Amino acid sequence: MSKKLARCSLYVLGMACLTVQAAEPLTSLDKPEGRLDIIAWPGYIERGQTDKQYDWISQFEKETGCQVNVKTAATSDEMVSLMAKGGYDLVTASGDASLRLIMGKRVQPINTALIAGWRTLDPRIAQGAWFNVGGKVYGTPYQWGPNLLMYNTRVFPTPPDSWSVVF
């Protein structure tokens, strides 16, 4: 994801996820409110602490005048718990947490028409079941990658061919 796309996505998401009380998606973007509180996985939304190339916040703050506050969470359960307590505008939840947040009414639908380039997304990503519920879109894809099944060859001399060995 380019830095510009990351900044744009952050802006749109921040504006689209203003409060849980709003039942319908926004119809237009207004001036930023001045503060954006985010729950994120460590390393997902950075100020360049670990690598100067990954400072996604400073330019966003400069362009919008909106202060970004990031609270990192180590697990999906922690993200869901923090969102339940309130006070956050955006969460970088994984699929398992996304559905809990949606069903728990902790997030609101977003208006994808306000997101530049939404129509160009691969439908496999844009229509993800982990953020599309009841005909409404509750999130945007941030990253996409494999979930690997690794195993100990001493325990499984024949490679597992299904996740059923885990669940």
Place the predicted regions along the sequence by residue.
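Pocket-edge structural micro-motifs
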Residues: 40, 151-153
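Early extracytoplasmic/lumenal segment of secretory-pathway proteins
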Residues: 23-101
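Short helix-loop capping/hinge motifs at secondary-structure junctions, enriched
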Residues: 154-161
